[in-house]
Amino acid sequence: NKIKPGVAYSVITTENDTQTVFVDMPRLERRRANPKDVAAVILGGGEGTKLFPLTSRTATPAVPVGGCYRLIDIPMSNCINSAINKIFVLTQYNSAPLNRHIARTYFGNGVSFGDGFVEVLAATQTPGEAGKKWFQGTADAVRKFIWVFEDAKNKNIENIVVLSGDHLYRMDYMELVQNHIDRNADITLSCAPAEDSRASDFGLVKIDSRGRVVQFAEKPKGFDLKAMQVDTTLVGLSPQDAKKSPYIASMGVYVFKTDVLLKLLKWSYPTSNDFGSEIIPAAIDDYNVQAYIFKDYWEDIGTIKSFYNASLALTQEFPEFQFYDPKTPFYTSPRFLPPTKIDNCKIKDAIISHGCFLRDCSVEHSIVGERSRLDCGVELKDTFMMGADYYQTESEIASLLAEGKVPIGIGENTKIRKCIIDKNAKIGKNVSIINKDGVQEADRPEEGFYIRSGIIIILEKATIRDGTVI
């Protein structure tokens, strides 16, 4: 006795009040989500203004994180661990490092996708006035490649997961898709509880008792922000946590029925450029838009401050998030580097990546990226050092020092606090980078650094001369 949802059945009985009637309840079969029917779209084309200057030469998803990963590895690994093997990556600004990393990691001898694929869809211009414009927003980026989803090889894709390239979290996307199917949703937003202090940075939602989104506000301020407060005990938070996090924030992770997404972009809202501020608020009245509450660790690291804090939080003894998990590992480019060599160093609460050389130095509450060189007397504290893309030999280093030049890495007796050191930076001897005056914002590109929210950022390939004080 199998029935389908939405089909009514009736039972005819006799008029005899004393006769007992036995009815077998028909069995409702739950439709299982199949990853073969799902495609993922990772948005990697943003200008990255909030993460500037880290994005001055590279796209946001290619920014290093955790010592040896790139931000793109997070949604890519989540897709692989969720068995989603049809992945599109949309790129635009500074895309060369991102394209190179994806090719090294996920093509060729990297991760195997079986009958799936990873396709990089770079922003292009086409004939006609409209075709001469670059991506104008998240929705416009997907619209420009809508023909890809109408292609014959993608005809069986029923649901499309849209992902961002600047978040830190571990998630099974198929649980999200299963929730989407169970509720017969047209659109599902993955949401997380948000604290008062950061709520205005996100799109906020209000939901009814069935989880349907009834109101959506993109980054509201003032009275509009207060109006979006909800009782988050209704989504499973304890009274204490609900008091701290009285908002429900959209994570920027969406699931669309494929036909609904195509209809929204082509016919309903052909001039709308952004999912969060335009498409989704407009779709609430006409479509079944559901919220999926994600209660594990999630961090939007789209600003320098949040990127810095989330990165250094990884160094804690018991971090809220860690890249290591034997069941759901995070993948990155295989670099075939030797183990790190550490001579007579003091290291506390730190992450030291592959292929580093540390000599008689101190590292505390810091991340040291691959191929880093820390010389004698170096003190590194509250710092994320991204490392280098290549080695300099001992003879090359000696030759540079003899010529009064600065090799890649950190020279003798240099003190560094609260800093992000971008790739291939050259920091000399007896340098002090401590921001003694507590400057919050400064632009010194000609001197090789910026300051954002009190955090010093040493630029990629910058040279900081011996004895410099910042």
From Swiss-Prot:
UniProt keywords (A-Z) are:
Allosteric enzyme, Amyloplast, ATP-binding, Chloroplast, Nucleotide-binding, Nucleotidyltransferase, Plastid, Starch biosynthesis, Transferase
> Per its record, how is this protein called by name?
Glucose-1-phosphate adenylyltransferase large subunit 1
Query: Which GO MF term does the entry hold, naming one?
Result: glucose-1-phosphate adenylyltransferase activity
Known catalysed reaction(s)?
alpha-D-glucose 1-phosphate + ATP + H(+) = ADP-alpha-D-glucose + diphosphate
The Enzyme Commission number assigned here is: 2.7.7.27
Any one GO BP annotation for this protein: starch biosynthetic process
Output the Pfam families linked to this UniProt entry.
LbH_GLGC, NTP_transferase
- How is the activity of this protein regulated? Activated by 3'phosphoglycerate, inhibited by orthophosphate. Allosteric regulation.
- One GO CC term of this entry? chloroplast
Question: Per its UniProt entry, what is the enzyme's top EC class, as one word?
Answer: transferase
Q: What is the lineage of its organism?
A: Eukaryota, Viridiplantae, Streptophyta, Embryophyta, Tracheophyta
Q: In which tissues is it expressed?
A: Prominently expressed in the leaves and a weaker expression is seen in the tubers.
